[in-house]
Amino acid sequence: MRRQKRDMFERAYLKGYRAGVSGRSKDLCPAANPQMRQEWINGWRDGRADHWDGYTGVSGIHRSPGIAS
C-alpha cells in the first residue's frame, strides 16, 4: 500500500484505466493537478481502447496494467 502512495502518477494512470474500461466519461477525472490529470487521461484512453476491443472482465486480465506486471 505504501508503494502506491509513493508513485501518484502511476496510481492516477491505473485509476483512469479502470474508469476507461468500465465505460465512464473522461469528464469525471478527479485530478486537479495538470500532470496527474494527464496521466489519468492517458490511462482512460488506454482503458477505452481495451473496452472497445473487447478486453473487459476476465478476457482483459492480461491487459490490465495493475495485475499483469
From Swiss-Prot:
Stored Pfam families: RMF
Keyword Cytoplasm: yes
Cellular component aspect of the GO annotation: cytoplasm
Principal subcellular localisation of the protein: cytoplasm
Biological processes per GO annotation: regulation of translation
Signal peptide interval: none
Key words of the record: Cytoplasm, Translation regulation
Subcellular localization, as worded in the UniProt entry: Cytoplasm
Family indicated by similarity: Belongs to the ribosome modulation factor family.
Its job: During stationary phase, converts 70S ribosomes to an inactive dimeric form (100S ribosomes).
Protein name, as recorded: Ribosome modulation factor
Native source organism of the sequence: Hahella chejuensis (strain KCTC 2396)
